[in-house]
């Protein structure tokens, strides 16, 4: 964490230049940021607002020491979709607001017992398969949208647009250099959108009718015990992944943010940002690896850059035409992007197992991973009174319990 890192280019920059670099950072995050609300049916302008406010809250909790940007989390896409269908948006937001308690609990655990305590309760054998289930559970949604199911798009148009979008995103991710490599989603959406224009699939009337200035669509949360219990365990995977995000930005800047301001404070900041976003109708927040990559490339280590990125996000959220334009992006374009993004989530879970050197031939690990994968892919559910546990939440609970109950192999016992 204390490698010799070249000095930040932002240290002596003027406020004006810092503001433009902040806008650049927001642009890097923009594609992924708005993708979550577009997929889940939430308001894009609200997502921009809560990303900006969430980043500022994170900076407040961490003493403005960490150059990191928080925005919409992909881990909550399936839970939000299920929640909206089951309880409606207001109750779903109420359940998501309570996920901040998971971050608070982990923050307290780290404060009292140290970061090593997370390894005991949430080792790679627990977190890895849960993340895989998050990605695999979303795969059917991506395919259905790519094929134009439940939409007015013809099959041939849907496949053409989604595949062009996917191939463009793949090409940029693999072959592009520099900052371009960090925004493959933006390039994919642009290519798919232009093709849709040629095919006559875009209706610009909502953009024409929308005002330049309008308030983001805020939602007052409602609270339901079943929704809360369903959402709480889902926060475990992104909360543990938060540690990886902080380690990454520490490596990039040459500063150990796990010690100063401390992992307990970064977890608390992420949790408060997530709860605050949900309380007004925005998707939960998480740290963005794309922005960390941009920080590495540009060597802009000054946290003020992220303050400006947050301010830009808040300012743009009040432009009605931005939200209206984003709403014109066809679902078949989103489907093409999602096939890569959701698969990537599953790969992150696999890499968690690999980096953690999890021996899948060892009976204990094999049992944990197998049960979690079967429960997740097979849509297992458990009814307890009026509460039903299913999907990612059930998988997370089962993984934690099995990890605590099943005896470790002799060579794993400390």
Swiss-Prot record:
Cellular component aspect of the GO annotation: plasma membrane
- Alphabetical UniProt keywords: Cell inner membrane, Cell membrane, Membrane, Symport, Transmembrane, Transmembrane helix, Transport
Catalytic activity annotated for this protein? uracil(in) + H(+)(in) = uracil(out) + H(+)(out)
What lineage is on file?
A: Bacteria, Pseudomonadati, Pseudomonadota, Gammaproteobacteria, Pasteurellales
Out of the domains of life, which is the source?
Bacteria
State the similarity comment: Belongs to the nucleobase:cation symporter-2 (NCS2) (TC 2.A.40) family.
List, in alphabetical order, the GO biological process terms annotated in this UniProt record.
uracil import across plasma membrane
Q: Which InterPro entries match?
A: NCS2, Xan_ur_permease
* Segments in the Periplasmic topological domain: 39-42, 83-91, 147-155, 200-224, 320-332
Annotated positions binding uracil = 74, 241, 290
What PROSITE patterns does this protein map onto? XANTH_URACIL_PERMASE
- Protein name listed in UniProt: Probable uracil permease
